[in-house]
Amino acid sequence: MGTIDYSPRGKAVARLKEGLEALRREPENTLYRDGVIQRFEFTYGLCSSMLERCLMHAAPIQPDRKMTFPALIRTASDLGLLHSGWDVWHGFREARNLTSHVYKEEIARQVVEKIPAFAEEAEFLYAELEKTSA
């Protein structure tokens, strides 16, 4: 697995955590909140593609036999790349799907509540992938 460069994903995780820290200091700042939600969106997307790429590299999947997202998460969890399994990641996925509705205050709050746990998962995933590529 040594040929995959995961550093852009690590930068995305760092930026997400930076946004969370700013929001923690000013929890009513909607600009920070919206920025954290946007950083969550792109970090979530990068984590998903990173997992797929990693697993395809480790055990090539035929293009016509692409893993479903739940199977991808379960496999990555079984391999120790994730702290949590599908039950937790399903919640992250639901939050990601809600991000198109963040103009609704209650939905924005629901999404933001899940982001700190996601950031920890993303950081763990990045660290595990860095270990495997070393």
Describe every region a protein language model picked out.
Residues 1-134:
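Solvent-exposed interaction patches of small proteins and small membrane subunits
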